[in-house]
């Protein structure tokens, strides 16, 4: 926070005391004094030539202590007829009366000037130059700066945590998507395995129906074979024809039938064993496939359960991260709201301090203007008093003495820039005025 203060230092070529002014209570005292025109006549070297000299008239000046409105005029008339003036007693008495009135007027002005200087000195001693010390606000400013820095650090830390939570949520979302795709693939595999199991069950049912049909066919063949054997036996037993021939002994039909029977029995047994072996091999293969499919199904179920547990865990973590994110965002909003309110209060304090500083500068400028007006009035009064004294003392009166005395006043303006109570820059400007 920078504070710019400016003050003026004045120096005059004439011997006029210069004093600094502080803020004075404003009083308005208005008094009007009408002073008659005074004339002073004095002989000059050139007789017969008239000279008319007029001094400047002064108007009232209103300041912090208030000065009466004064209007004075000196009218000096000198004629070339010196003998006429000295011989005229009436004019001499009038001249003396005018001098006496001028003397009394000068005494009154000196007393008024003394009173004015006394009031100015008393006002300066009472209040002194008002300098605003903003050092008492420095701890508050440092504390507020520290709070703002802490709030900025906390805000950055919260933003970092939110970013980390967002990245973690994105990672969990990617993992969830990958696990979901894996789950969908496993479910597709399970659906395919179920289809394979259904096909295997259909094949098993077809094989069982074929086995049943073969068993029925075997039973039917056995039954037909038994019937044929019984018919042959009946035919042999009921055959009563006996033929004796001298031919050699033929083959035994019973033996032949026995051989045929044994041959068919062996063929039936062989077919039965082959059918049984084929059926058992088919059943074994189907059982192996069923076992493999069952194991795969159990593994898939286990994997699906594991994936479900992982999905539930991830959903719980995702929900917790969402809750954490919501709480962090709420905390961030509260923090931003709180620090916005603090910043607004700081801005209000800053604006108030700037307003006070502006008011202080305006007061200093106003006091400087009042001081310049009082200084100008004082110099004019002193010039007028000096002129009256020369008139009363009867000294040589010249045209330059009656003219308004020109005085030069140097105005030195020093501008300093204060930062934290230290002067960081300074500039000086000097102006010269003539009065």
From Swiss-Prot:
Tissue: Abundantly expressed in an even distribution throughout the optic nerve, localizing specifically to the astrocyte domains. Moderately expressed in spinal cord, brain, liver and oocytes.
InterPro entries for the chain: IF_conserved, IF_rod_dom, Keratin_I
Region (Coil 2) residue spans: 257-394
Biological process per Gene Ontology, one example term: intermediate filament cytoskeleton organization
Biased composition (Low complexity): 1-28
Regions that span the bilayer: none
Record-marked site positions (Cleavage): 246-247
Coiled coil among keywords: yes
Region (Tail): 395-435
Family to which the UniProt record says this protein belongs: Belongs to the intermediate filament family.
Family matches, as PANTHER family: INTERMEDIATE FILAMENT, KERATIN, TYPE I CYTOSKELETAL 18
Note: There are two types of cytoskeletal and microfibrillar keratin: I (acidic; 40-55 kDa) and II (neutral to basic; 56-70 kDa).
Name by which UniProt lists this protein: Keratin, type I cytoskeletal 18
Native source species: Carassius auratus (Goldfish)
